[in-house]
A protein has these predicted regions:
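A glycine-rich, basic-preceded beta-loop-alpha segment at the flavin cofactor/substrate interface
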Residues: 51, 90-106, 111, 118-149, ...
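Glycine- and acidic
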Residues: 1, 16-18, 46-52, 62, ...
Length: 327
């Protein structure tokens, strides 16, 4: 922690989550990346990871990869996955930048959207890795990353909704087309602004409602997180787990709901813009392209549903979380 966290918090080093491989994404029990023990207590990491956000760049001095891999004697499936730190540059004795680790970028993906994010294929060729936590318990540790990332992806969905609305509203006020069926609204103009047309108003109000409602959901989740933090600071384990369970139950709802609605809001934006919505220069088509990934990464919408019902409601609490939430 003393070696890595100060650099990561300061932003001089950055990090990645290396889970997905060519043959598996959601089903991480199929992970094939190997971790062979070295005599000095480190591990030799070999394998290929794909879809790694910011996997390679020169924006920071070092990139710290958090990698799921298997030890030689690991059990099959998800019970045999361990977690490793694999830095791009091995830290020197003084905490600075040391020698280059054999982690290379095989390619950068050419994507439909989020093109400013370098999505990399990473090859690990006996790279030096350091075990995090217990052997074969890596997936449990990684889920602490993933749950936080799912909340962040829900916020991404909210951002796309709000951006679509903020762009659609002024366009609808300025663009003029015909007279409304309910009567002329702007007699001094050649035609009424399209915001007065019922269908356009409906789409704008839908964007606005989803955006404001989504923001309320984010605040609700933030309250749970604040309560968890407060309990942790007070050393109250029972209270911490109470709010952790609530946030865990709420996370797949928030992630799945807000990301799906972000696509709908972007779709409405393109409809409001008409033909201009299909043209790159106007920007609305980029929102539609960028929003699409949010329903896929950090667990697809279907996976969120399985997590909610299977793990959070039935397996973990036998329905107690629902009863507590609605009480």
């Amino acid at each position: 922690k003393n070696l890595y966290l100060p650099h990561l918090v300061a932003g001089t080093w950055s990090g990645t989550m290396c889970l997905t491989e060519p043959q598996c994404g959601t089903d991480l029990g199929q992970v094939k990346t190997k971790a062979e023990p070295n005599a000095d207590g480190t591990y030799a990491i070999s394998g290929t990871k794909i879809f790694i956000s910011a996997g390679e760049h020169d924006l920071t001095e070092n990139i710290i990869h958090i990698v799921l891999a298997r030890l030689p004697d690991a059990p099959a499936g998800t019970k045999g996955i361990s977690l490793f730190i694999v830095p791009k540059f091995i830290p020197a004795a003084d905490g600075g930048i040391g020698e280059r680790n054999p982690v290379t970028c095989g390619s950068i993906e050419h994507k439909m959207g989020i093109r400013a994010s370098a999505t990399a294929v990473l090859n690990f060729d006996n790279a030096v890795g350091y075990l995090i936590g217990e052997k074969n318990k890596g997936l449990h540790a990684m889920f602490t990353f993933m749950n936080t990332a799912r909340l962040g992806t829900g916020m991404e969905g909210l951002a796309h909704m709000e951006l679509a609305f903020q762009n659609s509203l002024p366009y609808a006020k300025e663009r003029r087309s015909m007279r409304t069926l309910s009567g002329t609204k702007e007699p001094n103009q050649v035609a009424d602004a399209i915001i007065h047309h019922a269908d356009v108003a409906r789409m704008l109000l839908t964007q606005k409602a989803f955006s404001e409602g989504g923001r309320s959901m984010i605040y609700h989740a933030s309250r749970y997180a604040d309560k968890m933090f407060e309990a942790a600071m007070l050393g109250d384990d029972a209270e911490f787990h109470k709010w952790d369970d609530k946030l865990g139950f709420y996370t797949p709802i928030l992630k799945g709901f807000l990301t799906e609605l972000s696509i709908e809001c972007a779709k409405h934006g393109m409809q409001i813009y008409g033909g201009h919505g299909y043209i790159k220069e106007w920007g609305m088509e980029q929102i539609a392209r960028d929003a699409r990934i949010s329903t896929l990464y950090e667990g697809t919408t279907g996976v969120q549903a399985l997590d909610l019902l299977g793990r959070k409601v039935l397996l973990s609490s036998k329905g107690k979380v629902v009863r507590d939430y609605t009480a």
